[in-house]
Amino acid sequence: MIRFSPCGSRRASLRLLLLLAVSNTAMATGTAGTAVDAARLAAAGTETANWIQHGRTQDEQRYSPLSQISGDNVEDLGLAWYLDLGTKRGLEGTPLVVDGVMYFTGEWSKAYAVDARSGKLLWENDLNVDRDRGQYGCCDIVNRGMAMWNGKVYVGTFDGRLVALDAATGEVVWDTLTVDLSRPYTITGAPRVVKGKVLIGNGGAELGVRGYVSAYDAETGEMAWRFYTVPGDPSKPFESPILEKAAVTWDPSGKYWEVGGGGTVWDSMAYDPELDLLYIGVGNGSPWNKWIRSPAGGDNLFLSSIVALRPETGEYVWHYQTTPGDGWDYTATQHMVLADLEIEGQTRKVIMQAPKNGFFYVLDRASGELLSAENYVHVSWAERIDLTTGRPVETDNSYKTSPVYQFPSPMGGHNWQPMCFHPGTGYVYIPARELAMIFRQDETFEYNPKFWNVGMDVMKDLTVPAWLDRELVKKVGAATAQGFLLAWDPVKQEEVWRHNSETPWNSGALCAGEDLVFEGTGRGYLDAYDARTGERLWHYDVQQGVIGSPITYTVDGEQYVSVLVGWGGAFGMSFGFSSNTRESPSTEGRLMTFKLGGDTQLPPVDRPRRLPEPPADTATSEQIDKGNQLYHKYCVYCHGPGGISHPNLADLRYMSAETHQMFDAIVLGGAQRERGMPAFSDTLNAEESAAIHAYLTRVGHRTLKAEQSRDSTWTSVKHWFYGVLAAVADWGVRMIAWFKSAAG
């Protein structure tokens, strides 16, 4: 459904007037993207006023030379305008700005256009995404952005479509399905346009799909080519000769094709017009567990690889695999940056990536040759990368027979949040984290087409007993999950500086001008740093966590910085303990834009109310235990361990009396489908739903008791003691990591 501002009437005459008004607005500020073609995309670096494509330029450096805002005056940055988006889900997008109009996406792949000067809404289109597909989302109902070409903007939708919209009006030009809806595919990544073709990948490898990237004609929506990243059923013809070669790196006894094999291209791409090479990042296996997926071993190409293709045909050129035979969800879908670096006295055309596995890679982007690799965060799965073979020298990291405590966790040393490259400093700025996990074999694994199929017993480590104090869970969890903005020298392969972000789940980075780097934090601030020293120069309270990536642009000669504000995503959904739900209250997601001297004020935040009285706790211990297990199997990925959700999702410890009464209608009947909560009637029965409800009721009573005594001396002492335990836990984690590294 499309809406125009300021009026939503559907009468034809008024609709025509609104269309004319929107078109006139676009013409007044530019051409609404009608002139964006191959030449303009290639020359995007010279258009300092605009942010035409996802990484601003085709090399994905996310650097803007705009310098009106500088280290000398950034402290004068203030809010110019904001736009409430009416959502409390994660906002991961990078806006585009073309000729005075800003385009961006929100939750459920909703598309928006606003006046980049004032924030006035020009149009919005919710694209009618099937809300039932929400059950297939590993990592929230997010979207990371758009692409633009010849008067159209392109959006990949959560339910697997690629949609072209008229940039001036938001009307659908064409709409094509890119996935098999019988499989749990989703799309959250931003498309790219190269040589008149729209490129889009997909996600879903946690549940079980086969990955690929597709190219569509930008004018007609017809598919031009498709490149599968992993082989299919070996008894059937291979789609290309390279897949026949890749198939020998898989063990067919694992019947990987039944689950899917994985290898989704769910985020990063880059393009070099001189070499005419498209680079795609390939994800993890389906299932994660390589001993289930490919029992005899093998590299399992092209999982966790950077692959170079010809953009006109999809022809394979080269690949580099960062994690051969990945068994830990160490994807190589993370942001890739192209640059020319002076290495050993020679200028090398390189591609750089900091994938999940914790190593920073510098490759020759023409050939795929590995030039250097060093760990940018603590790793324990491998000692180093052998520069002769290009392969990791692995430690004893097998969890086939016994659990392994390992760095990084599946959240990675770096996830989808884009890094940026500053050509002035020569440094890359990485939204990094250090977080470990216990990897253990799922001894009872059986493929379930409606649920996660990772082949690891993740639930055992996420399950929180009903009796355990949630404040202790939160403090220990937060203390052992570190996040920071890391300045990295890609030539010397060493850390320059880091700044603690206080949470491991933050925004992408923006490099700007001579000396600035911007990053938003999960604690609810937008920060600016000195790019050379790491000194924080500006610290602005945006009222909730930031995971969207900031951009900068100018209109009428005035520079702005914009960012989408709304916490969520994979970590934000699953690990509510990383944010204090009382001190980080829920607010609606917003688009926020800053300029020098901006004086707009955000409305005050309403603090959460006290916990309502839960219904009577009459369940048996057997019911509570059953509910605990079921909750941590089916509910934990969205609602968090022990019911501790992040601030912007339903915290099930705080259910109202009405929600308690409607529990079965919500869980089994889909009463909250439009808000992203699908019906689980095909997964749970009434008895199981009642057990989950009983467990959450018990948790609610314990939370209420804690709330009622939170101002007491005993509570203060207890929380102090929990803080000490959390510090000890953090120290213990680091000692384990150190000893494991020393032993390796």
Task: Name these PLM-found stretches.
Residues G30-L79, P234-E244, R391-E394, V473-K475, ...:
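Blade/loop signatures of beta-propeller domains
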Residues N628, G640-R673, P678-A679:
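Gly/Gly-Pro-rich "capping" loops immediately C-terminal to redox-active cysteine motifs
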Residues A436, I551-P608:
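Blade-level signature of beta-propeller repeat domains, shared across WD40, Kelch, NHL, RCC1
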Residues W51-G55, G90-K110, Q135-R161, T186-L207, ...:
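Repeat-blade elements of multi-bladed beta-propeller folds
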Residues A38-A39, D606-L630:
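Electrostatic cytochrome c docking/interface patches
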Residues L83-T94, E124-A147, D175-A190, Y228-S268, ...:
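Extracytoplasmic beta-rich repeat domains
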Residues I200-Y212, S253, I280-N300, E434-A478, ...:
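Short, conserved, GDST-rich strand-edge loop motifs in beta-rich repeat architectures
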Residues G156, Q623, Q661, S681-W738:
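C-terminal capping alpha-helices of c-type cytochrome domains
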